[in-house]
């Protein structure tokens, strides 16, 4: 169960912070959605999927927003039974493909040694995992803790507020995002992550710091160049999903005031959720960041 929770946290980390394309100047992770005929406002919150449990905070502003809404909508319905097992199963390659078959002997040895020496994990146990998902495991030691889950904390808060929980996507939807990127490109990213691991560790720490200060603009500037070598990655991992979510968010907000929570990387950019909602005619205002 521990490895399942760890990998789930790492898996969803990529969806939080991959290459947002434009900055939001306001320092806030919580946004109020109103106008365009909405009887009551909804709220949009940007999550991070790699955080030590003691750093996960449901703030007073978030509590107030949840009190003013009737349902919680996440990327995935984390309250659904068996979702972690489903995600683990879907993260594995099919038809007997393994990471060894995708790498040169030299790169495979590099990966095997890295897993053993730096992570204390045998590669054999994860050899069938899709390369890009395997690379997320490298991020975990930076925290020096067993990651907590903002999503599960929000689910717990929703239960306390007697709110229903729903998801914008299914596990199959999220895995399909990775499947749109060729395995060879994923493998190249995996090897690059190892060779540049010291730099990667610093970047992750900086991203977490920027998140904690709610500096979305600074976060954007830091990660804008990430994964640039992977063709169409930004569209597959971020923009296409935002566009798909927009009608769902609109319809849901019209039906009931809703607390939406998605990866923070989805908020910014010319095709980010905030901009898309504004272009659709809604008022989207930053809720003042709490100290």
For each feature predicted by the language model, list its residue ranges.
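Bacterial Sec-dependent N-terminal signal peptides
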Residues: 1-26
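Short, low-structural-confidence N-terminal segments
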Residues: 20-39
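Short, glycine/charged-enriched secondary-structure capping and boundary segments
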Residues: 23, 58-59, 87-89, 273-277
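Short secondary-structure boundary/capping elements
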Residues: 25, 54, 240-244
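Structured, acidic catalytic/metal-binding patches in enzyme active sites
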Residues: 33-236
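A cross-kingdom marker for long, charged
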Residues: 232-291
């Amino acid at each position: 169960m521990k490895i399942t929770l760890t990998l789930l946290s790492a898996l969803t980390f990529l969806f939080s912070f991959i290459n947002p394309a434009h900055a939001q100047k306001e320092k806030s992770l919580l946004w109020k959605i109103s106008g365009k005929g909405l009887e009551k406002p909804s709220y949009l919150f940007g999550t991070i999927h790699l955080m030590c449990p003691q750093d996960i905070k449901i703030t007073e502003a978030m509590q107030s927003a949840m009190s003013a809404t009737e349902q919680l909508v996440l990327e995935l319905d984390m309250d659904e039974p068996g979702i972690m097992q489903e995600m683990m199963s879907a993260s594995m390659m099919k038809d007997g493909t393994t990471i060894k078959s995708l790498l040169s002997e030299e790169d495979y040895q590099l990966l095997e040694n890295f897993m053993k020496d730096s992570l204390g994990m045998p590669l054999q146990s994860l050899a069938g995992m899709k390369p890009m998902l395997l690379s997320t495991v490298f991020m975990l030691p930076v925290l020096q803790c067993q990651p907590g889950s903002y999503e599960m904390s929000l689910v717990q808060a929703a239960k306390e507020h007697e709110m229903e929980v729903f998801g914008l996507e299914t596990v199959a939807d999220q895995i399909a995002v990775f499947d749109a990127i060729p395995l060879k490109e994923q493998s190249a990213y995996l090897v690059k992550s190892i060779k540049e691991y010291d730099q990667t560790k610093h970047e992750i720490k900086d991203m977490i710091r920027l998140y904690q200060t709610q500096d979305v603009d600074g976060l954007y500037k830091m990660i804008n160049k990430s994964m640039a070598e992977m063709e169409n990655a930004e569209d597959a991992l971020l923009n296409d999903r935002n566009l798909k979510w927009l009608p769902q968010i609109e319809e849901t907000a019209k039906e009931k005031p809703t607390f939406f929570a998605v990866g923070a990387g989805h908020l910014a950019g010319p095709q980010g959720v905030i901009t898309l909602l504004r272009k659709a005619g809604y008022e989207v205002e930053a809720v003042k960041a709490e100290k």
